[in-house]
């Protein structure tokens, strides 16, 4: 028995609430099995008061989306001086902003796709760049709001400028990179295996293919050339360090090998709060490296600190 009291934060009030609840329950259950004393907290606006009264030894942050991974809850935990998992205030805020995180990664030598930051209302009826391209909300996760504009579309989709859009006015318009979906997790200061994601019946790795059982296949380690494998690991670790991440992060890539085995590798984004659901990538990647889910979570708890 470890004796440590771990508060697992989950749920919250972002668009990724259901994903967070799934992550939180899986993590809390496994940590209990590891011998930790666990309190599950479905986060609301009173979370600071709850934590002051609870006085946990460590907070395991299983929140996703705004407030959970944008530096906000991290700032609360720093103020309360409660050690916590994952990245700190600055890295969390930076990584949540796809455009700014991309600029920092590119400055560190990571290969990125061409893009521009826009207000969604400025897109109008004319293409902001030559199709195909992707429109992404700047501060959303789980592929919420991602729109792929194909070459044969005469105009941008109307939903981007409509009242139905609920992902903020700032969007990133990014050149579409064809090819295979690859991802690489970083644990501490170590790049783990590269994993290929193969969506089953989906155009890309969207919300359903991420969280619906059987909607995607994870191949870890990915079947790619050794030099490409190492290149992806290097870029994942470079982005992790440049953005200032701590604990576990996961970087997503596109690998276009349609015309040669060497192909082209492009970094897409980094996730400082990767999912920990039964269908999530990081647990699968860790398992392929011989690290069980319990060992992964225990390492994260023991790695927790303030001033991250």
Swiss-Prot record:
One of its GO terms (cellular component) is cytoplasm. It comes from Brucella suis biovar 1 (strain 1330). Residues 102-302 form the ATP-grasp domain. PROSITE patterns: ATP_GRASP (PS50975), DALA_DALA_LIGASE_1 (PS00843), DALA_DALA_LIGASE_2 (PS00844). Pfam families: Dala_Dala_lig_C, Dala_Dala_lig_N. The gene is ddlB. Its cofactor is Mg(2+); Mn(2+). Gene3D superfamilies: 3.40.50.20, ATP-grasp fold, A domain (3.30.1490.20), ATP-grasp fold, B domain (3.30.470.20). It comes from the Bacteria. InterPro entries: ATP-grasp (IPR011761), ATP_grasp_subdomain_1 (IPR013815), D-Ala_lig_Van_CS (IPR000291), D_ala_D_ala (IPR005905), Dala_Dala_lig_C (IPR011095), Dala_Dala_lig_N (IPR011127), PreATP-grasp_dom_sf (IPR016185). It is found in: Cytoplasm. This is D-alanine--D-alanine ligase B. Binds 2 magnesium or manganese ions per subunit.
């Amino acid at each position: 028995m470890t004796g440590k009291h771990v508060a697992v934060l989950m749920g919250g009030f972002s668009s990724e609430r259901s994903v967070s609840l799934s992550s939180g329950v899986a993590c809390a259950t496994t940590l209990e099995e590891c011998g930790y004393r666990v309190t599950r907290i479905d986060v609301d606006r009173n979370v600071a008061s709850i934590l002051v009264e609870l006085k946990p030894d460590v907070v395991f942050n299983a929140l996703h989306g705004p407030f959970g991974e944008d530096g906000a809850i991290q700032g609360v935990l720093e103020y309360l001086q409660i050690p916590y998992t994952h990245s700190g205030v600055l890295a969390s805020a930076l990584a949540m902003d796809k455009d700014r995180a991309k600029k920092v990664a590119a400055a560190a030598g990571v290969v990125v796709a061409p893009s521009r930051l826009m207000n969604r209302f400025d897109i109008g009826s004319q293409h902001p760049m030559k199709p195909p391209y992707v429109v992404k909300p700047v501060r959303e996760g789980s592929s919420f709001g991602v729109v792929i504009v194909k070459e044969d579309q005469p105009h941008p989709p109307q939903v981007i400028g409509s009242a139905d859009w609920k992902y903020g006015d700032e969007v990133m318009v990014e050149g579409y990179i064809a090819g295979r979906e690859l991802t690489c997790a970083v644990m501490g200061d170590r790049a783990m295996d590269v994993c290929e994601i193969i969506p089953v019946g989906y155009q890309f790795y969207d919300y359903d293919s991420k969280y619906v059982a059987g909607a995607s296949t994870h191949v870890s380690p990915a079947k790619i050339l050794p030099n490409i494998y190492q290149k992806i690991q290097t870029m994942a670790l470079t982005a992790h360090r440049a953005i200032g991440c701590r604990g576990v992060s996961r970087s997503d890539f596109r690998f276009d090998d349609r015309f040669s085995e060497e192909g082209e590798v492009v970094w897409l984004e980094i996730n400082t709060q990767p999912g920990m659901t039964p269908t999530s990538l990081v647990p699968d990647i860790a398992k392929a490296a011989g690290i069980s889910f319990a060992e992964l979570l225990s390492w994260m708890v023991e790695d927790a600190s303030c001033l991250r």
